Curated annotation (Swiss-Prot):
Domain of life where this protein originates: Bacteria
Subcellular location: Cell membrane
Organism expressing this protein natively: Methylobacillus flagellatus (strain ATCC 51484 / DSM 6875 / VKM B-1610 / KT)
Chief location of this protein within or outside the cell: membrane
Metabolic or biological pathway: One-carbon metabolism; methylamine degradation
Name of the featured protein: Methylamine utilization protein MauF
Any one annotated GO CC term: plasma membrane
Transmembrane segments: 37-57, 58-78, 116-136, 143-163, 187-207, 210-230, 263-283
Keywords recorded for this protein, A-Z: Cell membrane, Membrane, Transmembrane, Transmembrane helix
Length: 283
């Protein structure tokens, strides 16, 4: 039997069983080096201009706090383009056909998922805050800002492919077999905690390192918990899309289509926020 005939038989067999997702033939592609370099320069320019505008509108501390909150929330959202982000959106869904009843039955899963993220923020943020209180409580605020800003610039260039930065990550995934052993609400809690700890699974955004650094060097336990909590809010909220009548394949295809653009947004944010922070320190 020819290969084409075998493939035809397999396809017809699949159709008789479960519905198959069609193969993708077009994928998100990285831009040319020239375009990426232009985006880098525009990010730095936007950051410098934005820093100067913020300096004239408010105090440096308020401006830096606002910039960091935006960066942390956006970083949490951009982590959706990690393998664990794809998985949580796919696995933590209402069972059966979409209806008000199915969404109502699924709601506890979302809320336990959010609770898991909150627990992760308390554990990770508490540990970082305690370590910072012991080691860095006397570190001048300007030193921390300068260090984190330079680190953000480095990782911004890394995201655009012009610099190689260290990327220590545990290349692990949420345990998919858990869905066969626990009820949906328990799975939501376990996944939320694993993802909320941020270093138990692979996270595809270096904004995590900036968030971790700020939580560590702030030297205060409560502040560190809030910092990790802000990042985790950005991570958790995308799962709320499953409250809507959107098919799983639609969500997954949309994520795949914007994969490279998410990396560019990541780099743009790091470069612009890092540049703005340095401008605020200089002025």
């Amino acid at each position: 039997m020819s290969i084409d005939a075998k493939l035809s038989r397999q396809a017809s067999g699949s159709k008789a069983g479960v519905a198959c997702v069609p193969d993708a033939y077009s994928f998100s592609e990285a831009r040319s080096p020239g375009t990426r370099f232009a985006l880098m320069l525009s990010a730095v320019a936007a950051g410098l201009a934005g820093g100067a505008m913020l300096h004239s509108a408010m105090s440096a501390t308020s401006a830096l706090t606002g910039l960091f909150i935006v960066l942390a929330l956006a970083g949490g959202f951009l982590s959706t383009w990690s393998p664990c982000g794809y998985s949580s959106l796919s696995l933590l869904r209402p069972a059966g056909r979409y209806s008000f009843a199915s969404v109502l039955r699924w709601s506890p899963t979302f809320f336990t998922h959010a609770l898991g993220y909150a627990i992760g923020a308390v554990v990770l943020g508490g540990a970082l805050g305690m370590a910072g209180w012991l080691l860095f409580s006397s570190l001048p605020f300007s030193y921390m800002v300068a260090g984190m800003a330079v680190l953000a610039l480095g990782y911004g260039a890394h995201q655009f492919g012009f610099m190689k930065m260290p990327y220590p990550q545990r290349r692990a995934q949420v345990p998919h077999d858990a869905r066969f052993r626990f009820r949906s609400s328990v799975i939501g809690l376990l996944y939320g905690y694993a993802l909320g700890m941020n270093y138990l699974t692979y996270v595809q955004t270096p904004i995590l390192y900036i968030v971790t650094g700020v939580a560590l060097f702030c030297g205060d336990v409560k502040t560190a918990i809030v910092i990790i909590g802000i990042f985790n809010i950005g991570r958790c909220l995308p799962v709320a899309v499953n409250f809507l009548p959107v098919k799983n394949v639609t969500v997954q295809v949309w994520l795949a289509r914007w994969q490279e653009r998410a990396v560019e947004v990541d780099g743009f944010l790091l470069l612009s926020v890092g540049s703005a922070a340095l401008m605020l320190l200089v002025l």
